[in-house]
From Swiss-Prot:
It comes from Shigella sonnei (strain Ss046). It is an enzyme of class 6 (ligase). It comes from the Bacteria. One of its GO terms (biological process) is DNA replication. The active site is at K124 (n6-amp-lysine intermediate). This is DNA ligase B.
């Protein structure tokens, strides 16, 4: 009873999560959006099944198909059958292909396993499903999966694949096998290489005419022997003897979900001879094949890998002004998970880059993780029917603006605070962008160093700053007063690298103000252009005012 209650709760939670992300569209808008995406997916289906080609990555197709189903459920439409091929000239399967139900996570897998025993795990090989029929020891028929009941006659094509045994003996002499035709790979590491659109490539080779030589790049992984030996070990041994060696090599007995998770992770990182998109867990005990029906297999489930890239909906476009005055564009996203990381924002880049991408709220973009886990945009995979893009702010900012606070300077001013508090500058631990915004909103800073005047009481009474952290923050602000002169000059935004500034041997504000352009130009990595920028910087009225203010605060190097 507890098991079924847990399953019911999981279903309700899943339904709630689906409904929680339903778009706020009018019925007319919903009909238009659903119709447009439906037509596009139908076109991709036609290309895939009739022409053997694919204009879209497998992962993108799968996720957009899921998005369409979600929209249809949200607005009361009938969900479509995913990847339903045409039935022209179809051949009946001796045993139906059941398909496999997907588990959302390890907890769901554990629930499914509780009432089952003698379980085995296999890689979920990424290719196209096929039925192999052997009669009197010879390959008699090969049938594509189709709709699970009927498929295309692929006998001629499969007979040209050298990796598929054309003759068998013993228990397999009169047998029906189900498996996956896949693209042979040498040392494919799924974690690093991804799916490489393997499914579409295999489908293309099987659908095209006159490509007998290229068919030898294919092989088959048998994952089911309906009405075969009762013991899995016997099945695997007979299949290996007949030439289906991969099945025995990549089928392991498992006892619990933790063990499956370890194998799943191992295969994700290992060099394999095929592309995979997860694992399949199956019970050795199966019903008689006459009871097999599409969508009704209770003896096996799949646990797919988290996609390397996720399709995410753009919720908003936001503009940020950095400390140098450059405007950058950020896309706010409906949350997606990438490698256990929740991604809600992605940096697009400059305004020009954003305009080149042509991204608007409501669009669907493909997001992955670049180096150090930073989200990046790979592609715009779908644009909404109604698109309204915000107007970027005027480009009135530069490297010498917004040292002092004003309404128009809000974003660049905050960026300057974040910069000066970073580890490489003043090293103010425990405060980031949100903390600076809270302090500025409450205490209305005059300039970027106004925080030096805050008292412990003011910090303690700042909304958004935890009282337990206020004392620590005040301590950090006081410690900053003892930072070296060069750190304070960096906080003021001098256009030099730290190495060049240290090489200058400048140790006082008055000395720095009297240094000539020729002096700066002789520093390592500092040409004439950079030297002129330093002169412009130190002669700026805001910079001079800040220098005088720091002198009044008796900051090292600024004293008269």
């Amino acid at each position: 009873m507890k098991v079924w209650m847990a399953i019911l709760i999981s279903i309700l939670c899943w339904q709630s999560s689906v409904w929680a992300v339903c778009p706020a569209w009018s019925p007319a808008r919903a009909q238009e959006e659903i119709s447009r995406l439906q037509q596009q997916i139908k076109q991709w289906d036609d290309d895939y099944w009739k022409e053997g080609k694919s204009e879209v990555e497998d992962g993108v197709y799968d996720q957009l198909s899921a998005r369409l189903t979600q929209w249809q459920r949200c607005f009361g439409s009938e969900p479509r059958d995913v990847m339903m091929p045409p039935l022209n000239g179809a051949v009946m399967h001796p045993v139906a292909h059941t398909g496999v139900r997907k588990m959302v996570d390890k907890n769901a897998l554990s629930l499914w396993m509780r009432e089952r025993s003698d379980l085995w795990v296999q890689p979920k090989v990424d290719g196209v499903a096929v039925t192999l029929v052997y009669r009197d020891g010879k390959l008699n028929k090969a049938i594509s999966r189709g709709n699970g009941l009927k498929g295309e006659d692929w006998t001629q094509k499969v007979s040209l694949i050298s990796a598929v045994p054309q003759t068998v003996s013993g228990p397999l002499a009169n047998s029906t096998l189900q498996g996956e035709i896949f693209l042979q790979r040498e040392g494919h590491i799924q974690q690093q290489m991804g799916g490489i659109n393997a499914r579409a490539k295999v489908a293309g080779l099987m659908m095209r005419q006159g490509n007998s030589d290229t068919l030898n790049s294919l092989a088959v992984f048998v994952w089911a022997w309906p009405d075969g030996p009762q013991l899995m070990t016997d099945r695997l041994k007979e299949l290996a003897t007949a030439g289906f060696t991969l099945t025995q090599r990549y089928t392991r007995a498992v006892k619990n979900a933790d063990e499956i998770a370890r194998v799943r992770n191992e295969w994700w990182k290992a060099k394999l001879p095929f592309v995979t998109d997860g694992v399949v867990v199956r019970a050795a005990k199966e019903p008689e094949s006459r009871h097999w029906l599409p969508g009704q297999a209770e003896w096996l489930v799949a646990w797919k890998y988290q996609p390397v890239a996720q399709v995410a909906e753009v919720k908003a476009i936001q503009f940020a002004v950095g400390k140098s005055g450059k405007i950058s564009v950020v896309a706010s996203l409906a949350p997606v998970m990438l490698d256990d990381k929740k991604v809600q924002r992605v940096n697009i880049g400059s305004v020009r880059r954003w305009q080149e991408w042509d991204i608007a709220p409501g669009d669907q973009i493909l997001v992955s993780l670049a180096g150090q886990g930073i989200p990046r945009i790979d592609d715009v995979v779908w644009r909404g029917a109604e698109r309204t893009k915000p107007t970027p702010p005027e480009n009135r900012f530069n490297s010498l603006t917004c040292y002092f606070a004003s309404d128009v300077c809000q974003e660049q001013f905050i960026s300057r605070l974040v910069w000066l508090g970073s580890k490489q500058v003043l090293g103010l631990d425990g405060i980031g962008e949100a903390g600076w915004r809270a302090l500025h909103q409450t205490h209305r800073f005059e300039h970027i160093f106004s925080w030096l005047l805050l008292t412990p009481e003011q910090l303690q009474n700042t909304p958004g700053i935890a009282k337990s952290k206020s004392a620590q923050l005040w301590h950090q602000f006081n410690l900053a007063r003892k930072q070296p002169f060069t750190r304070w000059v960096m906080a003021m935004g001098i256009p030099l690298t730290r190495a060049a500034l240290n090489a200058s041997d400048e140790r006082s504000w008055s000395q720095l103000l009297f240094s000539t352009e020729q002096f700066w130009q002789r520093l390592p990595g500092t040409g004439s252009g950079r030297a002129r920028q330093v002169i412009e910087w130190k002669e700026n009225a805001q910079i001079k005012k800040l220098g005088s203010w720091l002198a009044a605060q008796q900051i090292t190097g600024f004293e008269p």
